[in-house]
Structures are given as C-alpha cells and as structure tokens.
Design a protein with these regions (language model features):
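N-terminal pre-domain/capping segments
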Residues: 1-75, 110, 114, 120-124, ...
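Short, compositionally biased strand/turn segments
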Residues: 1-4, 156-157, 162-166
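Short, flexible, glycine/charge-rich loop motifs used to bind or transfer phosphoryl groups or to couple energy/partner
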Residues: 7, 67, 144-146, 171-174
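Active-site beta-loop-alpha junctions enriched in small/polar residues
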Residues: 20-22, 46-51, 82-84, 131-133, ...
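A short acidic, amphipathic alpha-helical/loop segment
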Residues: 29-33, 141, 168-175
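Active-site acidic/histidine proton-transfer and metal-coordination neighborhood
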Residues: 56-157, 164
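Aromatic-lined glycan-binding groove of carbohydrate-active enzymes
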Residues: 168-191
Length: 191
C-alpha cells in the first residue's frame, strides 16, 4: 500500500521519493499525502513514445504529468523512451531490444532535443533515463545521446542499468557531470 511505502521511506531517512503506480495523479491528493510523511516529490518516470510520436503529440501527452510535477515542485522528470521496449517481457531476449540506425538516431536526437528545450522552458528539466531493453541502453548509446542532443537534455544515471549493460557509471559522473541531474543508485547481481 502507498502509506506503507511512504512511511518506510520516511523512516529510512529519505526526504524525497519518486512517484509510482500507487501514487495519486492529482496534486491536491498527492501533496497532502507526501506532507503526511514529510516527503517531497523528487521526480518520477515518464515513458515516452517519441520514436513514433511527433514532438507536438508527445507534448500533449505529457501535460498531466508535467502539471502534477510542477505543482509538487519536483526538480526534474525522469524521461525514458519506451516505444518498442522489451522491458517487462520475459519472453524476449535482451539481444532483441530496439535499436536505431544512423538516420533514425539523428531524427530522434532532434526530437529529444526539442522536448528537452520545451521541458526546460516549462521549468521541468528532462532527465533522460538509459534503461535495459530500450533504444538507449548501453554506455555507448548514452554517450551518443548526450553528445548529439541539446544541453537541455540532462541525464538520470542509473547505476544498476549501467552495470547490467556493462558500462561505467563513474565515467558519466566524471565526464558528464554538467548533464547529470538525477541518480538511481542500485545494486545489481551478475551471474
């Protein structure tokens, strides 16, 4: 239950928490619930379909979450591309994840740059989440994204996903610190 999640986060000493599926979607319900446990909304997942949607379509789709996050004074939005993703599908091998050719990559970087600028103008920085089973999974994918997008496209560094993809989280902390605005610190067992 939501109350147990919030209570345990607060008891563990956290002051912020990301939104999840159990969280109210309206700020007038969410803010009092967070206040009850002395927590703030530090971000939350937005699953984008920018590969298949136009930027204008994605801007329209993101509005409810953008409004919620702004009302809750969230510092950023964790943004991940989910179109074609294999995450959560136990019948698909990791090797079948979606990948982009050079032409699609260029178009995607332009679109994600436009979304980054839009969200920055809205006061809600886009914190791109590299993720297993998606188009931006590996260290190389993530470096290309950062090197080919506008500086408004920031990074959520997820240490578990980076390790699972055989990447180096320290590299991003050292080389891309100006783009790093959110982190997911995780352990990952590799067998």
């Amino acid at each position: 239950p939501l109350e147990q999640c919030l209570s345990e986060a607060s008891q563990a000493g956290f002051i912020g928490i990301e939104s999840g599926g159990k969280f109210p979607k309206k700020s007038e319900e969410l803010i009092p619930k967070l206040n009850e446990f002395n927590l703030h909304l530090c971000s939350g997942w937005y699953g984008a379909n920018l590969r298949t949607n136009s930027v204008d379509e994605e801007k329209n789709i993101i509005q409810d979450q953008l409004k919620l996050f702004k009302n809750c004074n969230s510092p950023c939005m964790v943004f991940a591309e989910v179109s074609g993703s294999i995450q959560g599908d136990p019948n698909r091998k990791l090797s079948t994840r979606p990948q982009m050719d050079l032409e699609e990559s260029k178009k995607y970087y332009e679109k994600i740059s436009e979304m980054g600028k839009y969200l920055e103008d809205e006061g809600m920085p886009l914190a791109y989440h590299h993720h297993m089973g998606t188009i931006i999974e590996t260290e190389e994918d993530t470096v290309r994204l950062l090197e080919n997008t506008h500086e408004s496209v920031k990074l959520t560094l997820d240490t578990g996903h980076m390790l699972f993809a055989q990447g180096n989280s320290l590299k991003f902390i050292k080389e891309f610190s100006e783009r790093l605005i959110h982190m997911h610190c995780k352990d990952c067992l590799l067998y």
